[in-house]
Amino acid sequence: MRCRPKLWCIVVLALFPGTLPAADLVFSVTEGVTYQATPKEIRDKFEPLAQALGTALKRNVRVVLVPKYNDVREGLAKQEYDLAFIHPAHVALAEVKAGRYKTLAWTAGYTEYTVSLMVNRNDTSKTLPDLKGRTLVTPDPDSITAWMVRAMLRTASIGSNEVKIRTTRYQDAVPFYLEYGFADVGATAANSVVKEWTDKGGKVFLKSRSVPIKYFIVSTKLSADEQERIQRALVTLAQTEPGRQVLGAVGYKGFVTPDHAVDTAAIDWLGL
């Protein structure tokens, strides 16, 4: 009697359940809305990292670009992504608070992100209450910079009707509003923007508290063993030459183990 192919497959799977290849691990990437980069540039950056993680996990890691914050929020809410690299912090931390994801790593060099409040050289502002009745420009309202500005105002008990807030999409557009009188104060977290502004004689009168900004989070659906292997692979990249080549491609110095107490404090401060 001939053994039908389907029956044979069932027998093989019963005897050798580990013979099927593991499903792809879905790795979503969301970069900030206030930086300008093409999808191809972002994908090219992260493919070597995906390959390195795949080697550590012995399974294929598939990169999925999710540029829009609301799109990644929707996917995270359904735990469609096994692993996610997310800039900005508030999107990642909302999922950490919800318990659907855990922080695996922070990005080295991006653990103390601060907002600078810039003014023209003759401005006399010294404290946040000095902003009352004035116009403040921030990047995109759903950028981490804008979220941090709102946290600063809330902490200082300044109501939303006491400061007029204008928004512009990109960080490097903020000085334009100050130069041409469309705003009195400009908020940015881009060091290059701050340097250019102060080099021209402008001032920074106040800085925010700092928060980590670029997060690696992992779905709580993954096993503890897989979570640990991903974290170990990330934080040890800088220790080997192949790992440093991966970091060179992605454009970061490395990844570090997070401090969960800092995450908890940031969740509270940002009002998530």
List the predicted regions and their residue ranges.
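Periplasmic-binding protein-like
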Residues: 23, 29-35, 109-119, 198-238, ...
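Acidic, polar ligand-binding/catalytic clefts
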Residues: 66-130
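Extracytoplasmic small-molecule ligand-binding "clamshell" domains
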Residues: 23-92
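Bacterial N-terminal signal peptides
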Residues: 8-18
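A ligand-binding cleft/hinge motif common to bilobed small-molecule-binding domains
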Residues: 88-98, 150-151, 155, 176-207
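Bilobed "Venus flytrap"/periplasmic-binding protein-like clamshell domains
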Residues: 32-52, 56, 89, 113-176, ...
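Bacterial N-terminal signal peptides that target proteins for export
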Residues: 1-9
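Short helix-initiation/N-cap motifs at beta->coil->alpha
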Residues: 63-74, 161-176, 211-212
